[in-house]
Design a protein with these regions (language model features):
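Sec-dependent bacterial lipoprotein signal peptides
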Residues: 1-30
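Short acidic, flexible loop segments centered on an aromatic residue
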Residues: 65-84
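Terminal connector regions
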Residues: 111-164
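Short, low-complexity, Pro/Ser/Thr/Gly-rich segments in the mature regions of secreted, periplasmic
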Residues: 159-178
Length: 178
């Protein structure tokens, strides 16, 4: 008889433990959930050097199903560690879900930049390797850093226009919050 009592008590405690475990899982699934999406992809859409003005369009792609709110950008393009173009400023930009926007930058290039792009346009070199790095400040995820390597090429039939091809990209990384 004692054996039967112990078995029933053991079964009762096992059922109680199982019920408590199910209650914990149920409570955990009801709490707030943090959903992190994919960071945006940033690249050079096009570049031109016309009338001593360097124009660059940076394409920012939102690869998520929800809008992304950008508050600031810091983008720099370098060739052989010499600054080619860039932008660092506050920017209020909402990018709709699964879409892209472009940020247009115009500046007066230095003589070195003009000479580099002229050598590319005149086919003295086939391409110019570039390094694109920087960060975007988003409302949702804070500061996201990015880096990529690629090459600039002249656009056939369009003097003064250049296109880019990315050869190596690192996904944006969240900076550690202080």
């Amino acid at each position: 008889m004692q054996f039967m009592i112990r078995t029933q008590a053991g079964a009762t405690s096992s059922l109680a433990r199982l019920a408590m475990l199910l209650a914990v899982f149920a409570c955990a699934s009801c709490g707030p959930q943090v959903i992190e999406g994919r960071p945006p992809f940033i690249g050079i859409s096009d570049m031109s050097l016309l009338d001593d003005t360097l124009s660059v369009n940076f394409r920012i792609s939102n690869q998520n199903g929800v809008p992304m709110n950008i508050e600031a950008i810091d983008i720099e393009v370098t060739i052989d560690s010499a600054r080619l173009a860039g932008e660092n400023r506050p920017l209020k930009l909402t990018i709709d879900a699964n879409s892209a926007e472009e940020v247009h930058v115009e500046q007066l290039p230095e003589a070195f930049t003009r000479d580099l792009l002229a050598s590319l346009e005149n086919r003295e070199v086939n391409s110019l390797p570039f390094f694109l790095k920087g960060s975007v400040q988003t409302l949702e995820d804070g500061r996201l850093r990015f880096e990529q390597k690629g090459h600039l090429y002249p656009v056939p039939g369009k003097p003064g226009f250049f296109r880019s091809a990315v050869t190596q990209a690192e996904e944006l990384r969240r900076e550690e919050r202080l």
